[in-house]
Amino acid sequence: MVALAQDLPDLAGKEIVVVTENAYPPLQFLDGSGAAIGWEYDAMAEIAKRLNMVVKYENTSWDAMIPAVSSGQYDIGMTGITIRDDRKEQVDFSDAYMRSEMVMLVRGDETRFTDAKSFGANADLLMAAQPGTTPFYVGVYEVLDGNEANPRIKMFETFGAGVEALRTGDVDLVLTDGTAGNGYVAASEGKLKIVGEKLGAEDFGFIFPKGSDLVAPVNAAIADLAAD
């Protein structure tokens, strides 16, 4: 792949500010020592190497990320962001770097429901979500009744807070992409599991301010990585 890499744009050591949330393992999160790690960090480091750019990381909340990138406060945003047409009105997306499907993450001893239909049928069951996210919309329209104000959806500022509420019994379901869901299950020592069929598929992309001249180089690097 050396020949391909030589054909990539050379950004001549340009500093790029990338904003992340550090709250969506295994894509990006803080390890036990407080270091930011994850698949997206590894991918961005490789993209930076191939494009000869220097990455500086900043941190913000999910609800602030798209507006902040849209306004030009940051050059790139990454936190497992689903490529959606409504978001394209505010930001530009890279090509997809990962495809995932929603899974139902529940406590390891859960027996009251086994799939989306049985969860939806039991009015006592609650799900966690972050507002405006793909899991929120999948929960509303594929699991529940299409009412975005359904009181069975409990809102949390971060994905991790929703998972913690699941662990403690404050909610009964978290929807997440399969990559993150499997990561949580593997680390849970049997306290979490995945049930039911996979739900709507989603493609993840990096986000940029509208008209950014970084989209084409990053897309070229993503294609180069995929060819490896």
Question: Model-derived features: where do they sit?
Answer:
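Short helix-initiation/N-cap motifs at beta->coil->alpha
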Residues: 41, 56-67, 112-114, 153-165, ...
